[in-house]
UniProtKB/Swiss-Prot annotation:
GO terms for cellular component: plasma membrane. The chain crosses the membrane at residues 1-23, 46-57, 73-99, 112-131, 141-164, 194-222. It comes from Nitratidesulfovibrio vulgaris (strain ATCC 29579 / DSM 644 / CCUG 34227 / NCIMB 8303 / VKM B-1760 / Hildenborough). This is Protein DVU_0532. It is found in: Cell membrane. HMWC (high-molecular-weight cytochrome c), ORF2, ORF3, ORF4, ORF5 and ORF6 in the HMC operon form a transmembrane protein complex that allows electron flow from the periplasmic hydrogenase to the cytoplasmic enzymes that catalyze reduction of sulfates.
Length: 226
């Protein structure tokens, strides 16, 4: 089972993940209206890209935007989870062993203590996000079973992996559960809200280009005929 999950199934999961996310990016770009978007973006690409990068970077800094500062609890929860969600899967030593075995390369590995800390903080962040969905009326009434499914899919690889790391119960069982839930995440990501892995950058980039080109950002230089 382990050989299958870290061999053919891993290849298939990564193919779906990267292929699906690439398709989402292509569909997003093709969905732009040439009369409203492309006609402005192409002639003013340089200033548009500058606005796109600035827009994305501001939202990647904790409390870097007004909206983050207005929701401190959610901001802390969001960054606790997402920092771990990026760093642990990519730089965990155990993951890089598999990368080296299956693909012939590896990334720098986090110290085990750092990886453990990031994992615990990521789980705490997910618990905080879940509590927010329960406690805030305006969030609770919009929450559906689909949202809980996304939270569960996001949490499962961290929880199962950490239980395996601590050798709670049967190690092999938790290890297989960790691999299965991790590959489930990869497979469902392109087809769910988890596609924000790339669509966040697309949407923030589009808004940044809009503000830089169309909505007054360009007044710092020569006026554009918009």
């Amino acid at each position: 089972m382990y050989a299958f999950l870290t061999g053919p199934m891993l290849w298939a999961s990564l193919l779906v993940f990267f292929g699906g996310l690439l398709a989402r990016v292509i569909w997003y770009i093709r969905g732009l209206d040439w009369r409203l978007d492309r006609v402005a973006y192409k002639p003013h690409l340089a200033i548009g890209l500058q606005g796109a990068v600035q827009s994305a970077l501001k939202w990647l800094v904790p409390f870097g935007t007004y909206s983050w500062r207005q929701q401190p609890f959610f901001t802390v929860a969001f960054f606790l989870f997402h920092i771990g969600a990026v760093l642990v899967p990519l730089f965990l030593a155990g993951h890089n062993v598999i990368l080296e075995e299956r693909f012939g390369f590896s990334l720098p590995a986090l110290p085990m203590g750092v990886a453990d800390t990031l994992t615990v903080l990521a789980i705490i962040g997910l618990v905080m996000i879940a509590l927010r969905r329960i406690a805030l009326t305006e969030v609770r009434i919009l929450t559906t079973g689909y949202d809980w499914f996304i939270l569960a899919v996001s949490a499962a690889p961290f929880v199962t992996g950490f239980l395996a790391r601590l050798h709670v119960g049967d190690y092999d069982t938790w290890l297989l559960a960790h691999i299965i839930t991790g590959e489930l995440f990869l497979i469902v990501a392109p087809f769910t809200k988890l596609s924000h892995i790339v669509l966040f950058f697309m949407s923030r980039g589009q808004l940044g280009m809009d503000y830089a080109i169309k909505r007054g950002g360009a007044t710092r230089g020569p006026a554009f005929p918009w």
